[in-house]
């Protein structure tokens, strides 16, 4: 995108893929679960891992970007892009190759003995669902509101909304949070 925008290129392919399913198969966790005797006393350990098994999925996409509109067929115009991070404000939410301590610090795998790698589920992908639950809607809407204000975009200008939600569980909460911030996009425009 930036290469085309700067005039350096006329065409570019932008692609991305994610294949988390290989991490999420239950058999990848079997030996760890056998070692987690405290699982009955601390079911949150299983939830931190299982939550992701149902929320993440494989996906891929590619776009051909060009410096001029397509002469035949549909063309989409990129008018602007924004990206926001809250890593400077919030604790780590998703992690692998370590474990999260009570104070929020991430202890890396290299600080564990090799015997503890499986015992402590160090290499499993985990998510701090409390951090997620407390912040996902608020920060998602905050970034949307900032982008809309910066680019003077009103809700009336939105024909379709493709929100980044992993589950319908988040849709009503996101809609409500948008409404609180003055972003009124009817659900029938959501895809």
Residues of each region from the PLM?
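Active-site-proximal alpha-helical scaffold in enzymes
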Residues: 1-18, 63-69
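Claisen-condensing/thiolase-fold acyl-transfer catalytic domains that form or cleave C-C bonds
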Residues: 1-5, 129-149, 154-155, 159-191
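A glycine- and small-aliphatic-rich helix-loop capping segment at beta-alpha/alpha-beta transitions
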Residues: 2-7, 27-40, 177-183
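Extended hydrophobic secondary-structure segments that form protein cores and membrane-embedded regions
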Residues: 13-15, 81, 160-164
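Acidic, glycine-rich active-site loops and adjacent beta-strand->loop/helix elements
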Residues: 16-21, 84-86
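Short, active-site-adjacent cap segments at secondary-structure transitions
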Residues: 20-22, 168-169
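Short acidic, glycine/serine/threonine-rich loops at helix termini
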Residues: 23-29, 90-92
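Condensing-enzyme catalytic core mediating Claisen C-C bond formation in acyl metabolism
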Residues: 41-138, 142
